[in-house]
Amino acid sequence: MYKRQNLVADLIEVFGDPIFQDQQIPERELKDLIAVSPSAAGAVRALYRAYSSIRDDAEALGHQPAQREKTSATRNATDAIEEVREYQERQSNYFEAIESAAESLRSELNVTPYNLAFALVDNLRSRHSVETKVMPATVLQNTLRQFKNHQQRLLLSEMLPVSGRTFQLGVQTAFIEQGELLDRTVEKAELKTADGPGILKSSLANYFAGALMMPYVEFRGAAQELKHDIELLQQRFMASLEQVCHRLTTLQRPNQRGIPFFFLRVDKAGNVSKRLIPSWQGDSAGKFKFARFGGTCPRWVLHDAFASPGRILTQISTMPDDTTFFTFARTLDPIGSWQYGGTAQFAIALGCEMKDAKNIIYSDGLDLKGKKPGVPVGVSCRVCERMDCSQRAYPPLHHRLRTEHGVRTVSRFQFEQ
């Protein structure tokens, strides 16, 4: 069952839509609905998601009936992506069977981070008769990895850095050697969408590759030793920034847990392309509420990262319920070239509750005792009660607009209390 505190946040956001402006439903009633009938509450959320998706498609396409079939396919894909995200959250983004498979292979290969890629190439050749070749970008163009099954050839793009080549070798190894394990895990998930199983299988293969590059016990120990210094972890495990940050969110093994980080990746427009929120019982990261039907709060440091590419930015953030989080964010280095997709820009954020911030190197020198208030952030403008926010894009639910021509405040909106 989808975690109740997340469902409450989702329904608050749902009923923050202007279409419900005449129905002022307090949070208490939403909690009552979830307590009495969680399935019905989940159905309301699913119905709104479908409505929201159709509305967004209609606004984007305008009067283009020829595009309706493509729009339906896009909507189905979006639903599948969200379904997989929620399944990963229910699992706390931790998969013990895949961890064990990765540990077994790494032990058999007897490798270090510095020769893992070569060992995987040899393993594919000796066990599966698969030859690996790095190809010019002019040949593969935008493709980074291509497996030619009939030729037993794995082609990797020269645009991939060492960490990317190792990762893609791990992904293809997962598909070839661990196909049955991946299929069993997908089957157990009991996903409802048509595209969900395929998306989840790819995600699990990526998980295997990350576990292969950064073995659980060793990586967790290094993260604690280095106070989660991302750059040093990159060097120690020959991994990329995103690979390291993603791996940190998977450290949820019972009795060997790491910090319960949440992770987000966005583009310059604020579109969320990756979201990982561990949600095991008692977890703090699960309390961080993300907008699931719109953009994130513009006051969050994640959006500032694009103005300082390559730098790690930090922020102590306070939600409207006074829950405080520590977040650090950075842009990702693009993979590719000017010709082949290398101009795409993304930023990622990793965050945790304040009680864990002292164990992160990037919090050194910050006021962690609460003497100074954190930066006020919210879920989305529709459900945020911060009346004086200078970055507010929409008026909040349950507050009538007040027009005073003789008064102008820092916010473009004025409201009745």
Write out the residue ranges for each language-model feature.
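Active-site loops and adjacent core secondary-structure elements that bind or stabilize anionic groups
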Residues: 1
